[in-house]
Amino acid sequence: MKYKKKNILFITTIIVIYLAFLFNWLEIGIFKPKGESISESEMLSKISRKDISESVRYSVYKTMFLKDKPFDIRNVYQIELTTHNNEKFHAEIIKNTKEELSFELLPRNKISYQYEFRPFSWLLSIFSILLNFINVLSSLVFTIYIFLAIHRESGKLNSKSLITSKQKSLFTFKDVAGNTEEKEEMTELIDFLKQPQKYETIGAAIPRGVLLEGPPGTGKTLLAKALAGEASVPFYAVSGSEFVEMYVGVGASRVRKLFKEAKLNAPCVLFIDEIDVLGGRRGGNSSGGNQEKDQTLNQLLTEMDGFTPSQGIIVIGATNRADMLDAALLRPGRFDRKILVNLPDIKSRAEILKLHAQNKKLSSDIDFHQLAQQTPGMSGAQLAAVLNEASILTVRNHKDFITMTELSEALDRVLMGPAKKSIKYDPEERRMVAYHEAGHAVIGIKLKHAQKVQKITIIPRGNAGGYNLMMPEKETFFSSRKRMLAQIQSFLGGRVAEELVFDDISSGAFDDFRQATKIARLMVTKYGMSDLGVSQDSEFSDKKLIDTAIKKIIDNCYARTKHLMLENKTLLDQIAHLLLEQETITQAEIEQLVVNTKK
């Protein structure tokens, strides 16, 4: 309602100003005389010389008041004339309203004339004065309105509603599946928020800030909410981007207001998501944006030094780019504790899937451990998306329960996108795609350190004509040279199969080459797994030597892949033929095919 009234006032003001200007424009347009303006004496001279070719028009142009005699009203007479040369002139004569103009010159010179007398109108004069007053007043009101609007918007920039982010967290650690070590690290923070005196007595200083670092979707925000929920304290959630504006000083002001509010509601948890936006390294160019960012970070550093541990404020920052943070933000006394939130392992993935499946109707054949095996490297958010997609597919298929069929399709949709069944290959293209995917599968089956095949399909998804779902035999903390070489060979398997069977190659392997080259480059420049030794890539490195070493790794892997493919040509043909028959092959069908091939 408040905004409606403001809008009505604004629109009314605009209309009044428009009408006032319109009236003035019409008045000028109607009464403005034509031609050049001349003096009264010049006009009389032209009449005397009989230079006038048309009739002369006399009219009251406007009414005026004398400054020294307010009640002495004068009419301004307008006289328009046209000469023999078709030149137009006009003149104005001021006379008292009671006086009469002398028209003796015109009849004497046999010039016809018209005289229009408009008597003085108090109503018209008052209306004219009132309209001019309204014009000035409305212009003033409009100016004030614009000024207040700018001031109000400036105030909004300066006090963006960060305080409204205060909430009571309904999450606890029971709502966070996996992340066992991370939850253990944060448990003592709960005790501090509940009983800070216990730590003060011993002289222990609880961390002022906790930095949660990890890939997107691993549950950093959820951990912060669960911490506040377990401790039953207010939870403030803001994003780092909310502090950064183009106007210098705005971000720093927001930081001050946020910490002021947090101190009034201590103990509490203050969560800053994407803190790398706010806390990135200072320096660089001296543009306005950089100055604003630096001032905001300086204010954050000051605020984190400005409250004592006894106030019970724990600042939690979340980022997936900790390497971008300013060193001053990471020193002891600010973000004292750093917790790495990794992607879930197979056990954690199974727990996450079970947690997100609690409110869903599932069939009895659901195997969460098997599904967890098929989802290596997936985050908690992606796993939640898989179950949600499965629920949607169940409704679409008019089923009452979610089955493994829907879960398998949902996994494909999350990883590769929806199936493009409308795309129809010609027989030769379809056969090439089948052999390409079969080539990847053969390497996964026959190479010792390669990832094992879970499913193969030639149904197009996203930009891929088909794909292999492969996973490592066991999850490891790091990768070895043999595993990395085997992975390169797996990527090259599709191209090798095309070359052997068709004596031709397609563009379908472009992403395979990109992935293989990426691994080879890391082996050379980062992991020291080439003939160049352990030297790191830098601006002083010999780029030609690096490229040569990468090419050598790729060429050797290609040769070994080709040799392995020739040895297992029968298995390659059988997998390709089965793919052409049913488009998708499961892990069980692949294992049975391998057994039959050995017989």
UniProtKB/Swiss-Prot annotation:
Where, subcellularly, is it found?
Cell membrane
- Topology: which residues are Extracellular? 29-128
The residues the record assigns to binding ATP are G214, P215, P216, G217, T218, G219, K220, T221
> Major location, coarse class?
membrane
Q: Where are the transmembrane segments?
A: 8-28, 129-149
Q: Which GO terms describe its biological process?
A: protein catabolic process; proteolysis
Report membrane topology.
Answer: Multi-pass membrane protein
Domain of life the protein comes from: Bacteria
CDD domains (alphabetical) = RecA-like_FtsH
The residues annotated as the active site are E437
Protein EC = 3.4.24.-
UniProt-listed InterPro entries: AAA+_ATPase, AAA_lid_3, ATPase_AAA_core, ATPase_AAA_CS, FtsH, P-loop_NTPase, Peptidase_M41, Peptidase_M41-like
Q: Which residues lie on this side of the membrane: Cytoplasmic?
A: 1-7, 150-599
**What's a GO cellular component annotated to this UniProt protein?**
plasma membrane
Keyword Hydrolase (UniProt): yes
Pfam families listed in its UniProt record = AAA (PF00004), AAA_lid_3 (PF17862), Peptidase_M41 (PF01434)
HAMAP family cross-referenced by the UniProt entry = FtsH
Quaternary state and interactors: Homohexamer.
Full protein name: ATP-dependent zinc metalloprotease FtsH 3
The record lists the lineage as:
Bacteria, Bacillati, Mycoplasmatota, Mollicutes, Acholeplasmatales
